[in-house]
């Protein structure tokens, strides 16, 4: 289907959140799955739009955002900004856990309040990272490849030489797609179930 890539604008925030809700579980939707539909995008979309909108791009079909790519040029800097500027916003809406996470939603909340877990030593040589999501009708048509190319150029211009992304084990099609684009898996000892893949930015 016809769509074009453009830089993110502030008015795209609800559209990006909608796409995240429709795709936020390894490409499948999470609408109605948690106590609020904002839970997943508040972890996987909002902080990037708020903290580093200069590296955010949307796929626009002329009516709305139907896909996006977001991320950071420096994961350590992003984690510091998340803790200083994004977590206070989250604490106004969500209650930190008082004990170990037990449910799926509690595991999401646990991840939300502990961004420092993203600072893994094996990923240090790959400072940039990204998240990409497209609605089903806009997959397998070159849009994902073009979004990734656009993002890598953006973070390269900001000084990042290499980028990583994470793929859940169940998302076999996504891993196959990334490997076709030249992303290579790396061993990460303390990773949650899934795979990390890396790619130079230029």
What are these model-derived regions, one by one?
Residues 125, 130, 141, 145-146, ...:
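Conserved active-site alpha-helix within GNAT-family acetyltransferase domains
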Residues 76, 166, 179-198:
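Conserved catalytic-core motifs of GNAT/GCN5-like acyltransferases
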Residues 25-44, 81-95:
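Conserved GNAT-fold acetyl-CoA-binding loop/helix
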């Amino acid at each position: 289907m016809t769509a074009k890539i453009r830089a993110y604008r502030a008015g795209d925030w609800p559209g990006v959140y909608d796409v995240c809700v429709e795709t936020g579980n390894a490409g499948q939707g999470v609408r109605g799955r948690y106590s609020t539909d904002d839970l997943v995008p508040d972890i996987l979309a909002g902080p990037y739009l708020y903290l580093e909108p200069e590296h955010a791009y949307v796929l626009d079909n002329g009516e709305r955002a139907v896909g996006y790519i977001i991320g950071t040029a420096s994961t350590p800097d992003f984690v510091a900004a998340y803790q200083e500027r994004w977590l206070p916003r989250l604490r106004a809406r969500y209650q930190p856990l008082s004990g170990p996470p037990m449910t799926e939603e509690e595991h999401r909340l646990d991840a939300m309040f502990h961004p420092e877990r993203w600072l893994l030593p094996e990923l240090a040589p790959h400072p940039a990272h990204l998240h990409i999501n497209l609605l089903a009708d806009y997959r397998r048509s070159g849009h994902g490849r073009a979004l990734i190319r656009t993002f890598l150029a953006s973070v390269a211009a900001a000084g990042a030489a290499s980028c990583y992304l994470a793929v859940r084990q169940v998302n076999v099609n996504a891993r196959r797609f990334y490997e076709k684009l030249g992303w290579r898996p790396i061993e990460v000892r303390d990773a949650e179930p899934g795979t990390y893949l890396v790619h130079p930015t230029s």
